[in-house]
Amino acid sequence: MYYHHSHQGWSGDYPRQQSWGQPPPSSYPYPYSSNAQYQPPPGPPPTSHYAPPPGPPPSHYYPPPGSYPSPAPSPYYGQHHTPTPPPQSSSPHQRSYHNHSPSWGQNLPPRPPQESQHFGRGAPSNYRFQYSNCTGRRKALLIGINYIGQPNQLRGCINDVTNMSTFLNEKYGYRREDMVILTDDQKNPMSIPNKANILRAMQWLVKDAQPNDSLFIHFSGHGGRTPDLDGDEEDGYDDVIYPLDYRTAGHIVDDDMHAIMVRPLRPGVRLTAIFDSCHSGTALDLPYVYSTQGILKEPNLAKEAAMDLFSAINSYGKGDLSSVAQTAIGFFKKAANGDTARQRTVMTKTSPADVVMFSGSKDTQTSADTFQDGEARGALSWAFIKTLQQRPNQSYLQLLNSIRNELEGKYTQKPQLSCSHPLGMCNASLVPPRTEID
């Protein structure tokens, strides 16, 4: 079932300052990867219990997007820049974010601390990150690709984006005019999820982000793996997503997505990412990975120093940021010897910002399409929305377990939670719903 989108601002009527600018060059300089060789995405996973998909749905017309200026380079962590306050908003729901509702009480998970946080014992004193209080501007990029007419066509990805946009607007205060939606059932060429449009939209999402802004990216489509070319992956493979034109333009590698959307972010900016695709466990290359028990696992932080952090202590999962695995001390000392903060950030894939990602499966797993509520859906997208509709105020640990409980017994995939910094798993997870703060 496919919906006709009638809301202004889904893929058009954006404010003038949001400009796409010129198309990116065909060959990207660093930090973009050269995807000279790539493999087609696999077919639908065997867990998909439905008949072959029908033909393409009727085309939907979307008004052309407003002009989007080409995003200027954002300052990297450690470089000098003049802080600017978050932009003022005239929208009622944004004005109300500055006063916490009394309903946030004893039975609700605590909000994250607002002071600057240290990465842990052994880290340089200036190596810090900042949680977001999510009182600033809200922007969302939603990408759904059914690969209409292609051999490995999917059924639920466009529905995922339709449902996610409604959910974010109605429950979390994201305005339609602050969303960019890319789906392959649109007539407007700027709203087609080809590689160039996806990369431009990712740049738009993070452009001019200020402390306490809430950015959101959702991808539903094919994902895969490709041999790692820069030696930063423990298993020797990079995670990739497949744009609509992957056969001619190539895939998009996790290194590139990290460089575009994570590396430029300033302290206190929240980026929430949902990747509902195969092999998406570390699609943003975030170093901290958590289990349903809240225990830090499989950290990539010490790879460059040839250290083992697999025995990282449970304090991260319990919200104790005062300590870190003892084995990390030597690595951080090495990073402090003459390296700039930016170099350390690039090397470790950490960030001073507040970046959290839920992915549909581990790096080695496939994700399933499902049929829920009378329509085809991505399993993670469906479970994410359902659990937060039933219980909006959950901690990270509760939300991860809720999603897994929805999927358990129906699918073999295990969703993952990863972060750019040590995460207090008992803290409140997402930005407050409008009903809690209006």
Curated annotation (Swiss-Prot):
Residues 39-74 have a biased composition (Pro residues). InterPro entries: Caspase-like_dom_sf, Metacaspase, Pept_C14_caspase. Keywords: Apoptosis, Hydrolase, Protease, Thiol protease, Zymogen. GO terms for biological process: apoptotic process; proteolysis. The keyword Protease applies. It comes from the Eukaryota. Residues 1-125 are annotated as: Disordered. The active site is at 222, 278. It holds the Pfam family Peptidase_C14. The keyword Hydrolase applies. Its EC number is 3.4.22.-. SUPFAM superfamilies: Caspase-like. GO terms for cellular component: cytoplasm. Residues 29-38 have a biased composition (Low complexity). One of its GO terms (molecular function) is cysteine-type endopeptidase activity. Belongs to the peptidase C14B family. Involved in cell death (apoptosis). This is Metacaspase-1B. It comes from Aspergillus niger (strain ATCC MYA-4892 / CBS 513.88 / FGSC A1513).
